[in-house]
Amino acid sequence: MKSFLISLTTILFWSGAFAAPPSLSVAGYPSIQAALDANPGKVLVVPPGDHEISEKIRLRGKGSGLAGAGRIIQTNPGQPHLEIEDAVAVEVRDLSLARPEGKNETRHEAIVAIRCRDLVIENVRILDNWSSAGTITLRECRDARISHCLVRNYMRISIDDRTASEDWGYAFRCTDGTAISLDRSSGCLIEGNRIVEERLVPTREVREQHGLGDFVKKNPVKGKIVNDVMWNADYSDAWQQGSAIVVNAPKDSSMTRLIGNQIENAAQGIDIHSDQVIVADNFVVNAFIGMKAMHGSRNVLINGNQFVRNSLWAIGLMPGTGADAGNSDGGSIVANNLISRFGEGDAAWIWGRERSPFKFDNGQEADDPPLRDVLVQGNVVDCIGEPLYRYAVIVAGGEDGPKGLRFDNNLFAPGWDGVANVELLP
C-alpha cells in the first residue's frame, strides 16, 4: 500500500509538472498573426512545413505564444520574425526561424522582446539571420529564460561608425553580429544554447576579401583613446565586432545567469557589462576573446567554464568608458576555469604574441576607477608544447591598475617569459 501511494504521488507530481501541449493550431487562419489575434492568451501550434511572412509577427498580452515544428521564413529583410512587447508569460517553443537565400542579410533581429516578464524562448532554431542586431534580443525584460536554442550564422559585414565619439573618431569595416543580447534586463537565465558562426571566420582571405579593419572615414582630430599607430595606419585590428552573448547596462541589468552554453567561432564569446552575473559551465571555442567583464561590472562569478583556442584573452576583467565613481568594476570571483590550446585560434595571426590567457587591465580613460577586489582561484591554464603566449597572466600596472587581486591554488602553465608579469599575491 505504501509503495502504491508513493507511485501515485509520483504520477500526480509529474502529470502536474508539465503543462499539456498546445492544441489550437494556426492552420485554417489567413495568417499566423490572424490566428494569434483570434485567440488571445493562447499558445498556438505552428504545424510542420514552411510558413512565409513579410511582416513581423506581434505577440502581446498574457499567456500567448507559438510552438511547434513549423519553419517561419521572413522574406522581408526590413523586418524581424517575432516582436514580443509589453507581454507576460509568453512562450515561443520548438520553431525554426529562417530567411530565404539571397535575403539573409538584415539589420534586424529574429526575435525581439521589449518590456516583457516571464518570457520563455526554448528549443528554437534560428539559421542564417545575418545581422548587426542581436539575433535574439531582450530589452527591459524581467525573469526571462532562453534555453536550448540553436543560433547558427548570425554575423554580417558592416561598418562600425565611431565618428560621433570624441573617444574614437573613425569608422571602419568589420564583421558584426550578436546571437543573444540582453539590455537593461534582470533575472534572466540563458542556458544550454548552442551558438556557432560558420561563415565569417577571421582568416586572412576573409579580411582581404572584405577590407576588414580598413578605415572608411576619419575625423580631423584623433580620438582621445586611439593610439597613434592605429590612427596613422587607417586600420584597426579589432574588426571582429559583436559577441555570441552580451549583457548590457551595468546600472540597469542584474541577476543574470549564463549557464551551460556552447559557443563556437564568435568574435567575443561572452561580453558582460552588468552586475550580479553568474557565468558557469560554458564552452567558448575559437573566439578571439573568450569572455570579458567591463564598463562597471560588479559581483561577477566566473566559474567552471572551458575556454579553448582563444586568441587574445580567454578571460579579461577591466574598467572601460562606461565605468565611473558610482559604477566601478570588481568584487568578483574567477574560479575553476580551464583554459586550453590558447593562441591556436583562427584570429591568432591578427594579435601577435603579446597576448595572455588572463588579462586584468586598467581603464580606457583617466577617470575610470580601477578594477578592485577579485579572487582568482582553482583555475588551470593547460599548455602542451611551446607556449604561444608571453605570460599566462598579465596585470596592468600604474596608479590606475587593478587593486586587491588575490590568486590562490591555480595551475598556470608559464609563457615564454614566465607565469605573470607581476607577482601574484595570495
Language-model-derived ranges and their functions:
Residues 33, 37-38, 52-65, 73-119, ...:
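Extracellular beta-strand-rich solenoid/capping regions of secreted or surface-exposed proteins
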Residues 45, 52, 58, 67, ...:
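Extracellular beta-strand solenoid repeats
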Residues 53-57, 74-81, 100-109, 130-137, ...:
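Short glycine/acidic-rich loop motifs that flank beta-strands on beta-rich extracellular proteins
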Residues 6-16:
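Bacterial N-terminal signal peptides
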Residues 61-62, 87-88, 116-118, 141-143, ...:
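Short "repeat-start/strand-capping" segments in structured domains, especially the N-termini
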Residues 170, 210-235, 353-426:
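Acidic, glycine- and Ser/Thr-rich low-complexity intrinsically disordered tracts
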Residues 16-37, 50:
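Right-handed parallel beta-helix/beta-solenoid
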